[in-house]
């Protein structure tokens, strides 16, 4: 899956190349690829490269099937599609690989600001995957999901590119649930002024 992730990162950064590649794929493959390119491209356009690597603390994620069970439990309890929750976790911390707080002070695998966690975290531990996923579902539900996912996601992170990216990855998983396992294996990359740097995965 690492090679696919690398390809999507290249295509997300080059609209012309992406159009050529997508035009040569079959309909089904093109639809999946377009979702990934659109989602990655939105984030690429919004976030600038960094000059220095952030001091990330990283760890292996919980097993994929365990996370999937947590997503399903949250969907059953709050009515928020598991694919949306998985897409949020993918973007926020690469399925829990990043354990550092964000520059804004957001914490845990679903990246909650402490005040938001106090309101929607259900008394759980923001650093525990199950608690964080349930808290995210609770917050998205209170913010308008599932009837208005875009609005709910904008409450979660008020960046249009973020909403576009979450929606793109979630839609791809809705069409093909097995894509969750591909996304689960995506690694942590940092875009720097000198190029991409991979922080997790094979050989590291």
Describe each region flagged by the PLM.
Residues 1-73, 160, 168-204:
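Cell-wall glycan-active module
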Residues 7-10, 14, 77, 91-94, ...:
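Amphipathic alpha-helical interaction surfaces
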Residues 16-20, 79-87, 100, 145-156, ...:
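Surface-exposed patches in mature extracellular/periplasmic domains of secreted proteins
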Residues 48-103, 121:
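Glycine- and small hydrophobic-enriched segments that form the cores of compact globular domains
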Residues 65-77, 83, 109, 114-170:
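Alpha-helical segment that forms one wall of the substrate-binding/catalytic cleft
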Residues 91-96, 116-118, 158-162, 172-173, ...:
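Solvent-exposed loop/turn segments at secondary-structure junctions
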């Amino acid at each position: 899956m690492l090679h696919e992730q690398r390809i999507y990162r290249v295509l997300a950064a080059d609209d012309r190349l992406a159009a050529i590649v997508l035009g040569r794929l079959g309909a089904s493959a093109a639809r999946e690829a377009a979702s990934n390119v659109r989602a990655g491209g939105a984030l690429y356009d919004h976030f600038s490269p960094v000059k220095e690597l952030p001091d990330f603390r990283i760890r292996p994620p919980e097993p994929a099937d365990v996370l999937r069970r947590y997503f399903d439990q949250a969907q059953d309890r709050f009515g928020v599609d598991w694919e949306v929750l998985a897409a949020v976790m993918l973007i926020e911390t690469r399925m829990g690989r990043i354990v550092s707080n964000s520059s804004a002070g957001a914490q845990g695998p679903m990246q909650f600001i402490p005040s938001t966690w106090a309101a929607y975290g259900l008394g759980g531990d923001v650093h525990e995957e199950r608690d964080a996923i349930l808290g995210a579902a609770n917050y998205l539900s209170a913010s308008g999901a599932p009837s208005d996912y875009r609005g709910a996601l904008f409450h979660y992170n008020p960046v249009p590119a973020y909403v576009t990216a979450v929606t793109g990855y979630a839609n791809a998983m809705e069409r093909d649930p097995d894509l969750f396992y591909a996304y689960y294996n995506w690694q942590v990359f940092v875009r720097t002024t000198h190029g991409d740097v991979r922080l997790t995965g094979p050989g590291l």
